[in-house]
Amino acid sequence: MPSRAASPALSENEFDITGALFQNDSDSDAETQKPTKRKKVPAAPNVNLDFLGEANAGDSDEDDEAFIAEKQTSANRKSANLKGRTVKKGGGFQAMGLNANLLKAIARKGFSVPTPIQRKTIPVIMEDQDVVGMARTGSGKTAAFVIPMIEKLKSHSTKFGARGLILSPSRELALQTLKVVKELGKGTDLKSVLLVGGDSLEEQFGMMAGNPDIVIATPGRFLHLKVEMNLDLSSIKYVVFDEADRLFEMGFAAQLTEILHGLPSTRQTLLFSATLPKSLVEFARAGLQDPTLVRLDTESKISPDLQNAFFSVKSAEKEGALLYILNEVIKMPTGPTEASLRLKEKGPEDSKNKKRKRAEMERAVNMKESPTKHSTIVFAATKHHVDYLYSLLREAGFAVSYVYGSLDQTARKIQVQNFRTGISNILVVTDVAARGIDIPILANVINYDFPSQPKIFVHRVGRTARAGRKGWSYSLVRDADAPYLLDLQLFLGRKLVLGRESDQVNFAEDVAVGSLPRDGLSQTCEWVSRVLDDDADIFAQRAVSTKGEKLYLRTRNAASAESAKRAKQVVTSDNWTAVHPLFQDEASNLEAEREKMLARIGGYRPQETIFEVQNRRGGKGGKASEPDEALDSIKRVRSTLEAKKKQRAQAEELEATTNTDGAEVDGDAFSDLEGDNANIPDNMSLASESDLEVTFSSYNTTDKASKSNSNSKSDSTPTTLFQNPEYFMSYTPANTSLAEDRAYGVHSGTNANFASATRNATMDLQADEGGKGFGEPRTLMRWDKRHKKYVSRQNDEDGSKGTKLVRGESGAKIAATFRSGRFDAWKKGKRVGRLPRVGEAETPGLAADLGGSGGSFGGKRFRHKSEKAPKAADPLRGDYEKMKKKAEAARERAASKVGGVTSGGKSEIRNTDDIRKARKLKQKRREKNARPSRKK
């Protein structure tokens, strides 16, 4: 038999497919080989060709999946980071190893270049590392964790069990996340469900039975379903805690701990937050495995385009100062805004069209991307201040929106949307409320209440002067806030300019402090006083805000001791009350002298008491009186105080001379430390061990001490220096300010140690009365009649009274109502025997049979529309009369139907509006068809 001709196509063993795999990869070394002549190879009988089976007999399927995923990622990547090659500058999503379908979805959504948080987090997440990301809402953090999730999950799994879990603090944020997942998941068959409070539990039972891939939920409802359905979470590979600081603030810590206990240890956990409270750091240490902290350096620095102005005011002038800044400095217009006028001008037909209305709102948002000179955000201390300022500014005629932590979610969304679309120009918020809001680029930021930490100041003013645009921040500083201002000045490392000490002031590089013009400020203060006298509601709101401020000041962080000492000198100086350099052109020399005179009168303190004045004038009746005992006691106290002042002054002079002599003797020994520690405040001894550990991690104290010791070798140093250079470690660093490190640590270089990285990034915001227990007595008791004793009233408020709380699997207390038996009743009603276990094959069409939405949110549901004749009432039943009346009413309704339309239905007679509308539709059809009328 003649031999068979060789096949023109090469076999799998002779054809190299690497060229086809990497044909678009410019960095691949593989090249397409030319076809070679086929050689005849004699067959080897009884040869076992299963080499892979013998070599990899012990390997698992997970290793194969990891190998395939790695190869596919390298094939998708346009430019690999190989030796001698670097990724292109400004590389987009193509350089991250994403598949083609996901890249198309990203381009369809309008993402061309990744945001900074996306550029930093996505490569780390793709390497299966746990990540703690600090980013505000609006920075693209939602896509930063959704894109890697879709890339990792790829397609729907036929094995039962969810693989992705996203926990959000509110229903609105969960809906927003679901929308992003749906848009980026186009082209895949991934199923996603939304589990939030307020929806039907039975429908959510059907959703979970439909084997979703991604679960987007709030912690309370997801824990309820977990306990009720006895869910097995061992299949989850990807967990995201979105707005984690908000989750802890709303009291979801117990729910998160219980959920975290049921997750597998092999999961990948991501945690995104706007700030990093201490409680969140502890949670991350316990729930994440060697996490990586991702924090943008740009969010920890003040923009160089930001100009700052600090105004010294008195407590009674704060409202007037705020109005003066809005009216005279920002030139804020009063009355309705242009956006609100445009909405009023629209006809009723346009307002009824939802699609057109939504398009107009989106167009308004896009127009708001470039800041106007009137968009302003005002930061207040508590929610009571927010309510008070909102009412006061509304009374002044401004268009205002307000947001605080405990505000209803729907109202919060409406208020923020009004500000974004330009319906209002001013947004009054608290630090807690503004932390995660997607606020557009602003032109002005006003600190009505000065922040207690430099971090919070940076967090506030970081919303303006973005993308190369100019911005202003105005801060009202009282005498009690001066220490915090000096702490901020030390942290920023800028020059402090009081009043008109310098003719040339750079508001972007200096901390310029001064007062507002007295004439304009007095007018606004008089207007505020008149409003408070006329409006009882605003007066009551001010009283409540004053009480809330007292509680806020009790919990506020204390300023440094050195700044408190300097603040006394700064506040008592004449330049503290001088006119701010911002108003230098407006005030003439005569006005400046007038301001100085008013400042002297305002700061006048009498040297004599009323008793001394009366005695000098001859008593109350104008005649000389005998020496009074009160007057004698006052004189004795005054003489004692004057003697103490003299002693203190002499002691200070003696100490100064002693220090001068010591500096001359040991000048060489302390010359090195003196220059380095010139700006170190005195409260450095209060630094904790963690702060010292962070500081000393990049500083070699032994070398520094040995260097100072070598420079100070003399005969007199052994009696002066007490430290042993071999063992002594100084508590102050020689090259950096520890106060700056404590205030805000900008990470640089390696970030391998999460604990040390989070110490500098931790920031706790003061509550704005939104937190439970703020301003309330800690122990509220009530009398328990049954047990004859006092018990805590907190049990009645959080549901822990009696047996309403049970311990979950992790030991945390959860509500006992989570296990109510509704899932068993639902299974019985749906005639479901047993749902598939995790890892088993899913049942096709199970979700549709159970009445779910097929694994998606917002699916169509069956509705009963058929009408049947009512059954006749049974005389033997107890509700015979009731059923008889129902049957008669149903027969009357059926008898009233004429021609299929009820008596209450729409009339078929056309009115003038119907005829006019029909003519318009007919004319539109004629124009659309573009056909001439038929000739008769």
From Swiss-Prot:
Keywords, sorted A to Z: ATP-binding, Helicase, Hydrolase, Nucleotide-binding, Nucleus, Ribosome biogenesis, RNA-binding, rRNA processing
Biased composition (Acidic residues): 663-675
Pfam family membership, one: Helicase_C
The keyword Hydrolase belongs to this UniProt entry's keyword annotation: yes
Cell compartment(s), UniProt: Nucleus, Nucleolus
Annotated ranges, domain Helicase C-terminal: 360-511
SMART domains: DBP10CT, DEXDc, HELICc
The enzyme's E.C. designation: 3.6.4.13
Residue intervals of the Helicase ATP-binding domain: 122-294
Function: ATP-binding RNA helicase involved in the biogenesis of 60S ribosomal subunits and is required for the normal formation of 25S and 5.8S rRNAs.
Protein name per UniProt: ATP-dependent RNA helicase dbp10
Gene: dbp10
